[in-house]
Curated annotation (Swiss-Prot):
Its job: Major role in the synthesis of nucleoside triphosphates other than ATP. The ATP gamma phosphate is transferred to the NDP beta phosphate via a ping-pong mechanism, using a phosphorylated active-site intermediate.
Cell compartment(s), UniProt: Cytoplasm
GO cellular component, one term: cytoplasm
Listed name of the protein: Nucleoside diphosphate kinase
Lineage, top ranks: Bacteria, Bacillati, Bacillota, Bacilli, Bacillales
GO terms of biological process kind: CTP biosynthetic process; GTP biosynthetic process; UTP biosynthetic process
Chief subcellular location: cytoplasm
Amino acid sequence: MEKTFLMIKPDGVGRGLIGEIVKRIENKGIKVVGAKLMTVSEDLAKTHYGEHSEKPFFGELVEFITSGPVFAMVLEGDNVVEIGRTLVGKTNPAESAPGTIRGDFGMTVGKNIIHGSDSVASADKEIALWFKEEEILSYDLVTSAWVY
C-alpha cells in the first residue's frame, strides 16, 4: 500500500489545527501509520528543503519551519500521495479551493499550514528522513472493507 508524508507546520500547530486536519485525513479513509509532535533542527530543515537552497526564500523557510513545533505524519492508502495533495490544496492558499486544508486555513504562501509529498519518490525520501522504520506501524482499520 502506498505511503506519503504530511507535516503540519508551526502555523498550523500554533493555531490548534492538528485535530481538525487529522480528522479530515481520517474521514477520507486514509490511515495514519506514523505521527509525532516535534521541533525541527536546522540541519533537518535544511536537508528537507535542500532543493530550495539556492532560492532567495530558503533562509526564511528554514527559520519558519524551526520556529515552533510541527506535527509530522506518515499516511497510508491507495493512491495516498495524490489524495493527500488534493486534501492539502495548492501551495498558495489564495489559489486553493475551499474545502482544502490550505484553502480553509492557509494565510500566505510562506505560512500555508501544511506540507505534503508531491510524488511517491519524494514521499519515500521524506519518510526516511523524518521517521525511523520502527516509528511506522502496520494495523488494520475496521472500515477497510468499505474504503478499499
